[in-house]
Amino acid sequence: LRQLGEALGMAVLVGEPSEPESIMRTAILTRLPVRSWRNERHRGRMLRSNLHCELETGSSTVPVLSVHCVHFAARFGERANGEARRIRELGALLEDIERGPAMPHVIAGDFNALSPGDNLEATAFFRLYNRMRRAGLVVEGQNGYLMRRPRNGSNDAEVDAAWLEFGIDPRLDMGIPSLPKVVSRLTRGMPAHTTLDRFLGRFLERWTMERLAQAGYIDVFRRIHPRARGYTCATWLPAARVDYVFASPELAPHAVDCGVVGSRPWPDPDAWNASDHFPLVADFAL
C-alpha cells in the first residue's frame, strides 16, 4: 500500500482494526493536503475502525472536507445478529462524528448492508454457492457453518487450481461468505428468478442504511441513479450493492456523478480481478 501511494503521489493513511481477530485494515489515499487524521478504534463495538481525516480542498465553497472510511462486519449468515453488529458499528461512527468539529463530510466504504428498496439477486447467488459446494470449494466448517475450502500452506497450488477450473480467480476466495449449512439444503435446486429474489429480499434486515438516512445522510449513488442496480459485490457474481458513499446534507448538492468501476461508463476489465468488490467512484464539484 505504501508503494502504491508512492507510485501515485498520494499520502497513505492506514487504520488498524479495533479487534485483534480482524486481519483487515482500512486506508485512505489522497493527493490533497491532509490537515489532520485519526483512527478511532472501538473495542467491543467495531470490528475494524473509523479512519478519518480532514482534507484541504483549495475550494472557496468547501475549503475543508472530512472523510470517514469504514468497513463494517459482514456476518451475513447471522441474519439479524449480523445487522445488529453493523448498527452498533454505525452508532460508534456517528458518535465520533458528533464529537468532532462540524464540517461537510463523506462516509465511504464497505458497509456490508443492503439499502431499503434495493434488489438482491439471491437465487443466482445460492445456485452458484451450491455449485461451489459440489465442487469442493465450499466445505462444512465448525458450528454447522459452510466456509471456503481452507488453505494450510501445502495445498495452496491445489486450491488455486480448483478455483481456476471453477472460473474464479483464486485471489478472490477471501470474499466467499460463511453461511449456515441449512441454507444449502433449503436452496438446493432453487431456480434463479427475480420474483423469488424480491420475496427473499423481504426477509433481510436493512436497519443500517435506514439509520443513516434518518441521520440525514445522502446515498450519493442513489441520488444520481434512482433506478440503477449499482451492484458492487461480488465481482465473481454481481448480486448486491453493499459499498456506498454517503454525503452530509450540506455536501450532497455538490455531488455530480457516482458510478461502479467495472460497469458502464467505466468497463475496466481489471476491476473484475482486483478485489471481490467493485470500486465505487463519486465526483464532487467544490
List each language-model region with its residue ranges.
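Active-site neighborhood of phospho(di)ester-bond hydrolases with catalytic His/Asp-centered motifs
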Residues: 13-16, 106-110, 219-222
